[in-house]
Swiss-Prot record:
This is Leucine--tRNA ligase. Its EC number is 6.1.1.4. The gene is leuS. ATP binds at K578. It comes from Malacoplasma penetrans (strain HF-2). GO terms for molecular function: aminoacyl-tRNA deacylase activity; ATP binding; leucine-tRNA ligase activity. It is found in: Cytoplasm. Pfam families: Anticodon_1 (PF08264), tRNA-synt_1 (PF00133), tRNA-synt_1_2 (PF13603).
Length: 799
């Protein structure tokens, strides 16, 4: 019987002692960069979600290594940020202490599972040698005008004691804004904050998605978040005033259908009118208690209050009423819309409520109609379709200086300050006049302190460290920035850090040597991780990469060529989580069933992108199959000279299917093919040696421990199983020479015959009438007609 605990312990030691997993780039081979989304090293340790994510990357990296690639598959730790700090506060520990302990535990668990990682390439975002370069990138962003301090309304989370980026704020089932981490309430609050101008790269972030092999769904998530819309701004003058309202519209061609102007509740004109109109003040108070979705959903009742001003239509010169509307928001365009009831459902509902004119503007399409059509009642746009009408009206607006073509984005600049302790310090100083000076000596170390509790006032705990905060240089006084960078900073460039890791330090990010390494290894070929990072980590990392490309640090435009989002592991239909008490510890199953069985089960559950239920009976079954594989080698004779025509065909079919499925990440189907092949092998007392060696090569991608043992004990090889090449198959030996076809008597199937491919009708009929089952049906009967479709079916009509 196969003892997985003894075998796995044995091979872990051998691999470590021999430095098998040490990365050495072979420049004669093509490169392949496989990457996992590196984890936050929590106290809970590795969970099944990690195993579901890391196993497919490991399987595929081994496959590419067998195919002759120089493969880099590294691992590291995303250790700064809120999770570590929250845990530190809850346990009254310092985050640095337990982070190191947790990392050691993670590494132990990872090694238990047989993942092929070179720990010499390990990165840790809290390592000063690492965050030196995070700080360097920030300085470059600042020097290039892409980082600045602004007075802005921020997402403030009192419970976490910090500001959050838009991407870190969720809307709960009740419509409340809550933090992604902990689901705590989030409110708007004015503060001075660092922002990074990600919006400068909005078009590149959309356009360059075409350079990637991402799923349409993942691309659309990013496109939707960026929210690009092309339209025009139009200026409506205010009657008897020098003021004007500038609206943004994605349909400027509908301008002749305008019957009102709608303003957001915080538009400057609304706030000005509020002081003179009690109705407006009451309406704004009502809106302040509503959630965004309660204001913008199509089926929500439209409400508004008429302002005591009139706008002048820029073309027709007609007076247009102005309303503050519940469904107009400040975060789109300029917080002002031109209401076109005939061309927008929400505008239509609003116009109906206030008895406003609804002018039909698209021929043969009653209001509201939002699709393409021929314009009517639209002056010089009459007879044009949407595209032509938009082009013509934009030209008119620009020529007459009453508007212009404009691109609008939902994406906002990245709020980059956090009022917490556990993060990268900003490498800047402020002089007594508030001017910013960048640090020359990097890294600027995070000072040690046990007082890490958020102040709750908007200041970081670092503000209490007066000796660190206040700096004297050449008799001048300076003050350090006391905010820290968000947890996303290190993950924006860590995939580059793996390539530059050199002992305990890193090659300079801006060196020629680094550029040459990046030329060889970028982009990352396969990146596997959760879809929850689609508008956080993935968007931020792409932004930083594009900036680094702009300043000639990296040679290419995109960091990650192919991304696969693995599914979740479910228990009773719910995601595994500590709060639900349904977490399954992988280490327990490594002990009880073995790492190979666990890895195989994880890949056999279904497609890696699917969220699938954890079934203990499933890993029990995989444990039995691992034993069955081992027993085959124990009980059968492995012979280099043995051959069997049928087994040879089955072997080549197996290798072909396994190779194709591996290439397409259909790992569950590869395992199915291995099971079928093992079943076939059990029919023989002898098995060909080469077949079994190559079977072990394929199996080793999933089950590295048992295959090393079989390779040594039964196949008598002194080299590692990983020293082999991926097996090849011979198409000629796969070709079928026979086929099974049904034989019908008077249209009913009575037998299935095996015939030679391409057999003539005479040959097939002769074979059929000699068959015992067919004889029983045609005895004492006359065959009046034979119907034969080659290689498909034979039908005998009898009387």
């Amino acid at each position: 019987m196969y003892n997985h605990n003894l075998v796995e312990k044995k091979w872990r030691k051998i691999w470590k002692d021999s430095n098998l997993h040490t990365f050495k780039d072979n420049l004669k081979k093509p490169k392949f960069y496989a990457l996992d989304m590196f984890p936050y090293p929590s106290g809970a340790g590795l969970h099944m979600g990690h195993v579901k994510s890391y196993t497919p990357t490991d399987v595929y990296a081994r496959f590419k290594r067998y195919q002759g690639y120089s493969v880099l598959h590294p691992m590291g730790w995303d250790a700064f940020g809120l999770p570590a700090e929250q845990f530190a506060l809850a346990t009254k520990n310092h985050p640095a202490t337990f982070t190191d302990q947790n990392i050691n535990n993670f590494k132990l668990q990872i090694d238990q599972l047989g993942f092929w990682f070179d720990w010499n390439k390990e990165v840790n975002t809290t390592d000063p040698n690492f965050y030196k370069w995070t700080q360097w990138i920030f300085i470059k962003l600042f020097e290039n005008g892409l980082a600045e301090i602004k007075d802005i309304d921020v997402n403030w989370c009192q419970e976490l004691g910090t500001v959050l980026a838009n991407e870190e704020v969720l809307t709960d089932e009740k419509g409340n804004k809550v933090s992604e981490r902990g689901k705590y309430p989030v409110i708007k609050k004015p503060m001075k904050q660092w922002v990074l101008k990600i919006t400068k790269f909005a078009d590149q972030l959309i356009d360059d998605l075409e350079l990637t092999d991402w799923t349409v769904g993942l691309k659309n998530i990013q496109k939707k978040w960026i929210g690009k819309s092309i339209g025009a701004t139009v200026k409506f003058k205010i009657q008897n005033s020098d003021s004007e309202i500038e609206v943004f519209t994605s349909r400027p061609d509908t301008i002749f259908g305008v019957s009102f102007i709608g303003l957001s509740s915080d538009h400057e004109l609304v706030l000005k009118e509020k002081t003179k109109n009690k109705k407006i003040e009451a309406f704004l108070n009502e809106l302040s208690s509503l959630k965004e979705y309660e204001r913008t959903a199509i089926n929500v009742e439209k409400k508004g209050v008429l302002l005591d001003i009139k706008a002048i239509h820029p073309i027709t010169k007609q007076l247009v009423p102005v309303y503050v509307c519940n469904y107009v928001l400040s975060n789109y365009g300029n917080g002002a819309i031109m209401g076109v009831p005939a061309g927008d459902k929400r505008d239509y509902d609003f116009a109906k409520l206030f008895n406003l004119e609804i002018k039909e503007i698209i021929k043969d399409h009653p209001a509201p109609y939002e699709e393409d059509g021929i314009h009517i009642n639209s002056d010089f746009l009459n007879g044009l379709n949407n595209e032509d009408a938009i082009a013509k009206i934009v030209e008119y607006l620009e020529k007459n200086k009453i508007g212009k073509k404009q691109v609008n984005y939902k994406l906002k600049d990245w709020l980059f300050s956090r009022q917490r302790y556990w993060g990268e310090p900003f490498p800047v100083l402020f002089d007594e006049k508030g001017n910013i000076i960048v640090e020359k000596n990097l890294p600027l170390l995070l000072p040690e302190t046990n007082d890490i509790k958020p102040s709750g006032t908007g200041e970081s705990p670092l503000a209490n460290l007066t000796e660190w905060v206040n700096v004297k240089i050449d008799s001048k006084l300076y003050r350090r920035e006391t905010n820290t960078m968000p947890q996303w900073a290190g993950s924006c460039w860590y995939y580059l850090a793996y390539l530059l890791k050199d002992g305990d330090s890193y090659l300079p990010l801006d060196s020629k040597q680094a550029y040459e390494i990046f030329k060889r290894w970028l982009p990352v070929d396969i990146y596997i991780g959760g879809q929850e990072h689609a508008v956080l980590h993935l968007l931020y990392a792409r932004f930083w990469h594009k900036f680094l490309h702009q300043i000639n640090v990296v040679p290419n435009k995109e960091p990650f060529y192919k991304i696969i989002n693995q599914g979740m592991i479910l228990v009773n239909g719910e995601k595994m989580s500590k709060s639900k008490g349904n977490v399954v510890n992988p280490s327990d199953f490594v002990v009880s069933h073995g790492a190979d069985a666990l890895r195989l089960y994880m890949m056999f559950m279904g497609p890696i992108t699917a969220s699938l239920p954890w079934e203990e009976s499933g890993i029990d079954g995989m444990y039995k199959w691992v034993q069955r594989v081992y027993r085959l080698f124990e009980t059968k004779q492995i012979d280099k000279n043995f051959n069997d025509e049928n087994l040879e065909k089955k072997y080549h079919q197996f290798v072909k299917k396994a190779s194709e499925f591996m290439e397409n990440f259909d790992f569950n189907l590869v395992i199915s093919e291995m099971m079928i092949f093992i079943n076939e092998c059990y029919k023989y007392e002898k098995i060909n040696y080469d077949y079994m060696l190559n079977f072990c090569v394929i199996l080793s991608c999933f089950a590295p421990f048992i295959t090393e043992e079989i390779n040594e004990v039964f196949l008598k090889n002194k080299k590692f199983i990983s020293d082999n090449l991926w097996p090849k198959y011979d198409e000629k030996k796969i070709v079928e020479t026979t086929i099974k076809i049904p034989v019908q008597i008077n249209g009913k199937i009575r037998e299935v015959l095996e015939i030679n491919l391409g057999a003539t009708q005479k040959d097939v009929v002769d074979l059929a009438i000699k068959n015992e089952k067919i004889i029983k049906w045609i005895e004492n009967k006359k065959i009046v007609k034979e119907i034969y479709i080659e290689n498909k079916i034979l039908n005998l009509i009898i009387k």
